Amino acid sequence: MDDILKHITDFGDTAHGEQLRKYSPDRYMVHPIRVMETLKSHTGDICILAAALLHDVLEDTPVTAEEIRKFLNKYLNEEEADRTVDLVIELTDVYDKKNYPRLNRRTRKEKELQRLARISPDGQTIKYADIMDNVQEISEEDTDFARVYLQEVRKIILELNRGNVALRNEALRVVNQAIADQD
């Protein structure tokens, strides 16, 4: 399984190209890797781990779902590749500024929350790990934005109640601690 995850990591890194994390000089791929590592302590499901590595590819790169599927078919069976792509699609923001420029941030986030509440339990589980990793970085590097962001993600975790219970509780603890540390 580690060999497969290495190939998927390389694909994700290539897809993200020269993209860097917003608050550090790190290649973007460090974030999906950390998300995947968090999930590894809760599941060995290859589809969840692969989707974690690719969760921002559709949102942040020109790579398409079909290109991801074609790549995954080299390493996973068809059912696993399809499930992984479905998870990546679930985790891709729909109500973003690019697609909905007339909606303000609050409205976009509310619509996105309603959408996320309907995604699969596995998708919600990945979202918990994604939030945990982003909270660490944003809380430390952008305290002004963190005040808004932390309330948004707390609301997401409270609403997304179908994923891995232990990871959801851990994510809620991380967010609540970050909120407490803001004061």
Where are these regions (language model features)?
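Active-site helical microenvironments for divalent-metal-assisted chemistry
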Residues: M1-D183
